[in-house]
């Protein structure tokens, strides 16, 4: 995982703790490549603040910042010493500028430093996941807009239940993804708080400015209590739970597409399928099966994270080193799965004739007939019994008439017009009648798709605002750091 266990000196652990067989076990240096850039940003912001607060001299700050530039140019792979990226960078800085490099860690602990780096990187990954959900929602809504009148079977218990439309079906997943987007954005708000200045957990006697480092790093504020700031990892739980929820949404969509593909309702584009190594006729929905499996990956990560955190005493424990990888891995997996699922839907061929034919199977319009009778004054429970009796006899008008004679004691025509019943039996007419808010009727769906588009636009703007704020902070940090170039000692 890291460099030779018997060579190199870690400036944090010193000679006494720098060697031994456990060094590799303790090390997270290789895994920390993900937060390498985050650590450099955190170091720069901290050094600028130390200088501005007259805690270290400007010449020392300039030297340290210059060394950090060298470390960045050399890359993570050049870090050979240190049990983690934070210690390794500090070691590299001291190697370049001597003892003045040791001032970089003034008024700071690795506890608050690590927490800041995790939050700094995690927020970027959360926004990437948000972007993926936005693109998926847009694709779902685009395809739905093309199929507001494409009738299809709707299911409960995987049995034909009621006819609906492809638009109604896809909009249901767009709605679920909108909630997933909302959960990710909510998590972002709690991730994007700075723990810097908490030090080990009890703060520091130095006259630091926590708000300044938060500003330079683009955080929306600070985690006020220093013990909470250093030890809290609930933001990881929230993020991983949001990722697992998103993966569960995608798993349902993927499962549907696998089933629909088997039934001949939809055909995935070749780019989202594969064939068999032995059976040349096969076209397998492999990508959807892997999307489906992502729900297991993310749920396992959430369970592992919760188990790691369960029962940890305040304030810092090394168990936390094993915590954040689960959040990163969950976000990686679900972001890719979202992109793949969206592409599969966008390029799929919905087989309208097959869908239309299947829409009426299993007497799926039965509820519509019962509703019609109830509208004409027949108690719904009685109408339900009548239609259930007719379903046993075939579910056509003749069966309904016979059931009416037995249950209502007279002809069906005394209660409802035959033409109305026949319309209720027709899947397309049945769908068109369901124009209540949220229903599948074309007019209702047009309104729903419009509202979904507006919500999508609002969420896209929220993403732009957050990324814009981070970019502004990065520009300001770069401007301030660059101003030290002219003061750097020769």
From Swiss-Prot:
Signal peptide: none annotated. Pathway: Amino-acid biosynthesis; L-arginine biosynthesis; L-arginine from L-ornithine and carbamoyl phosphate: step 3/3. Its EC number is 4.3.2.1. Pfam families: ASL_C2, Lyase_1. GO terms for molecular function: argininosuccinate lyase activity. Keywords: Amino-acid biosynthesis, Arginine biosynthesis, Cytoplasm, Lyase. Residues 426-452, 469-490 are annotated as: Disordered. SUPFAM superfamilies: L-aspartase-like. InterPro entries: Arg_succ_lyase_C (IPR029419), Argininosuccinate_lyase (IPR009049), Fumarase/histidase_N (IPR024083), Fumarate_lyase_fam (IPR000362), Fumarate_lyase_N (IPR022761), L-Aspartase-like (IPR008948). GO terms for biological process: arginine biosynthetic process via ornithine; L-arginine biosynthetic process. Belongs to the lyase 1 family. Argininosuccinate lyase subfamily. This is Argininosuccinate lyase. The gene is argH.
